[in-house]
Amino acid sequence: MVTPSQHALLAEGVAHLTDARTAPALCALLKQYLEELILFNTRAHLVHVTHTEELITHHLLDSLSAWPHFTNARAIADIGSGAGLPGIPLACALALYAPETELTLIERREKRIAFLENACARLALPHLRIVHADAHDLTPYTYDAITFRALCPLNHPTVYMLLNKLRPGGVILAYKGKRKLIEQETRDFLPQSCSVFPLHVPFLHEARHLVAIHTPCAAPPQ
């Protein structure tokens, strides 16, 4: 279960990233998700962490930190969602700020799907759904935004494949770390196709960025 000090850490982080009007409701949703994550992580090893506080800072708050960049999208896919990161924290925020947004968790591993089904059933968010599939099998031109955290480097062929799953004007929003590594991974992209936004994650003293990739970005690697 979530201890009072862990709850306080989560609540303070959420307050930094949102506003006083919605922070309590959002914190309540994230606490439910955190409880499911703690319960399943001990036996399913969904996320490698050493303590619950790390789950809060490095995963929940990190995922939540980019939510304002998703409010204009009406159909979002979280690719390789795994433990529901970043998709579930984003869905919790968007349920309050952009309630018509549909967010789909895409996951191909059976054990991860079982966890996602439990977590989503508990949260009961009407526009959050799960698809048990490989990203390659998704229908083209379906999403306004596609996101991922630890899927692959930005210059990997998978990224070019995902661009084909976007609607016209759509964007890939990828969570990344140091700016230098981002520059290395995007050096072959067209300059106008890629934007980098710093993310400020409460209590996390590491460089975090959100990379926006629009189509066309570059010729696919051979």
UniProtKB/Swiss-Prot annotation:
Protein EC: 2.1.1.-
A molecular function (GO) term: rRNA (guanine-N7-)-methyltransferase activity
Subcellular localization, as worded in the UniProt entry: Cytoplasm
Keyword Methyltransferase: yes
InterPro entries reported in the protein's UniProt record: rRNA_ssu_MeTfrase_G, SAM-dependent_MTases_sf
S-adenosyl-L-methionine keyword on record: yes
Assigned GO CC terms: cytosol
Alphabetical UniProt keywords: Cytoplasm, Methyltransferase, rRNA processing, S-adenosyl-L-methionine, Transferase
Residues at which S-adenosyl-L-methionine binds: G80, L85, R149
Superkingdom field: Bacteria
UniProt cross-references to HAMAP family, sorted A to Z: 16SrRNA_methyltr_G
Family matches, as PANTHER family: S-ADENOSYL-L-METHIONINE-DEPENDENT METHYLTRANSFERASES SUPERFAMILY PROTEIN
Alphabetical list of NCBIfam families matching this protein: rsmG_gidB
Entry's family note: Belongs to the methyltransferase superfamily. RNA methyltransferase RsmG family.
Physiological role: Specifically methylates the N7 position of a guanine in 16S rRNA.
Protein name: Ribosomal RNA small subunit methyltransferase G
Organism annotation: Treponema pallidum (strain Nichols)
Encoding gene (name): rsmG
